[in-house]
A protein has these predicted regions:
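A solvent-exposed interaction/effector surface
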Residues: 1-145
Length: 145
């Protein structure tokens, strides 16, 4: 599976979120996106990111998010989330979403991360980056073992 290691500066996103169970997230998160864009929650957000935060192995907060700009007003019900500078493992995906994204995500968590001898997670968050409807990346915060 193709991936790259890259250094990223600290950054902040703003997003609309909900807590999800890890067991049902592959079914529930696509529904959350549909509800968000078909409902009244969409307050000018493009949804560049799917930010998974406060992951404890059983559940996590998931935010449909965009880059936060300091002068930006945060809509009611939205949250600002910051990510530390550091190394990230970046895994591209190509194809229909959510299937292509979920396939790479399963590989990352079930094969790559348990199998790598060089890296470990450095934080309890990760990101889905949406480049188009059929292309994106999964970003995993890592550090050398």
């Amino acid at each position: 599976m193709e991936y790259r290691i890259t250094e990223k500066a600290a950054f902040t996103v703003v997003g609309f979120g909900k807590r999800f169970n890890s067991e049902t997230s592959y079914t529930e998160i696509p529904k959350f996106w549909d509800e968000y864009y078909n409902g009244e929650g969409c307050k000018g957000m493009n949804g560049m990111f799917g930010a998974c935060v406060d992951c404890d192995g059983e559940s996590f907060d998931y935010y449909i998010a965009d880059i936060y700009l300091p002068w930006q007003e945060v809509p009611e019900g939205y949250k600002v989330v910051s990510f530390d500078a550091g190394e990230w493992a970046v895994f591209p995906w190509h194809g229909e979403c959510p299937e292509a994204l979920q396939s790479v995500n399963t590989y990352v968590w079930n094969e790559w991360l348990p199998g790598t001898k060089e890296y470990k997670l450095r934080a309890n968050y990760n990101l889905e980056v949406y480049l188009s409807d059929t292309e994106g990346e999964i970003w995993l915060p890592i550090e050398k073992v």
